[in-house]
């Protein structure tokens, strides 16, 4: 056992309103070279629907094949778009 005092509820509230609460925002602001796509998955809705289908059907994958295929199609389309965008940019700038 440690001799650390138990954290006060005030400390926990401060933790979520202090600098730790904005850590991601600060990181994103300091990383302007990061593309928006690295923080946002356009296929998240399809992924969520797949997971909801699995939960609704007790894990029976055969019942959710349409949702899985929709996710695969979305992901493939997104990856192809990203590849094309990278192909059209130069190594030394925009």
Curated annotation (Swiss-Prot):
Domain CHCH: 40-82
UniProt entry keywords in alphabetical sequence: Disulfide bond, Mitochondrion, Transit peptide
Protein name: Cytochrome c oxidase-assembly factor COX23, mitochondrial
Cell compartment(s), UniProt: Mitochondrion intermembrane space
Location (main, coarse): mitochondrion
Motif (Cx9C motif 2): 64-74
Function in brief: Required for the assembly of cytochrome c oxidase.
Cellular component, GO annotation: mitochondrial intermembrane space; mitochondrion
Motif Cx9C motif 1 boundaries: 43-53
SUPFAM superfamilies assigned to the protein according to its UniProt record, in alphabetical order: Cysteine alpha-hairpin motif
Location of region: Disordered: 1-21
Annotated InterPro entries: COX23 (IPR051040), Cys_alpha_HP_mot_SF (IPR009069)
Record GO biological process: mitochondrial respiratory chain complex assembly
Entry's family note: Belongs to the COX23 family.
Cysteine disulfide partners in this protein: 43-74, 53-64
């Amino acid at each position: 056992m440690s001799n650390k005092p138990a954290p006060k509820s005030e400390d926990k509230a401060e933790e979520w309103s202090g600098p730790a609460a904005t850590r991601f925002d600060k990181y994103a602001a300091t990383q302007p070279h990061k593309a928006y796509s690295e923080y946002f998955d356009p296929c998240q809705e399809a992924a969520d629907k797949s997971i909801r289908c699995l939960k609704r059907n007790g894990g029976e994958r055969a019942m959710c094949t349409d949702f899985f295929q929709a996710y695969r199609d979305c992901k493939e389309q997104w990856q192809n778009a990203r590849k094309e965008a990278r192909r059209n940019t130069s190594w030394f700038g925009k």
